[in-house]
Amino acid sequence: KLKNSILEIKEKETDCNIVYSFNRLNNYCGKWIRHCGLYPDKKIRIWNRNIGMWEGKIHETIKFSKETKEVRLHGDLLHYSFNTHEDFRNQSFRFAEMKGESYFSKGKKNASLLKIISPMFFFIKNYFLKLGFLDGKDGFRICLVYAQATKHKYDTLKRLYNCQSKQHK
């Protein structure tokens, strides 16, 4: 379905200020994940390269140089993300560490309360409110790793502030 949507836009002459998005369906250890906050995993991935570029260390956002109009394409991009739970956990923690470093470089303060509340909130939101339990044991494992990675992000931020304060003594 997505392939046909892309072929349709290629055949048409389109406005260069239009950006195209679609849903990404993630595969975790051989299983399609439709909950846990991972679906629909909307991504903008098609745009005129003269009006936009990636910004951030881990492709966090796309920055457009002018006003754009987003058009949603039909179909899912099948994303074979992780073959093993360990791969998933390692990448989640690597991205969390990068996010903690980003917070530090932007001067975000280390809030001890956030370190406690955010992981719990993240788990509750994704496992219960976003129906992660419907993905069974895998849904539980995914939500648990994301909660742990959220804590790791704040641990990284705290570690960086501790290192900074030791250097200033």
Where are the predicted features?
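N-proximal low-complexity "stem/linker" segments adjacent to membrane-targeting elements
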Residues: 166-169
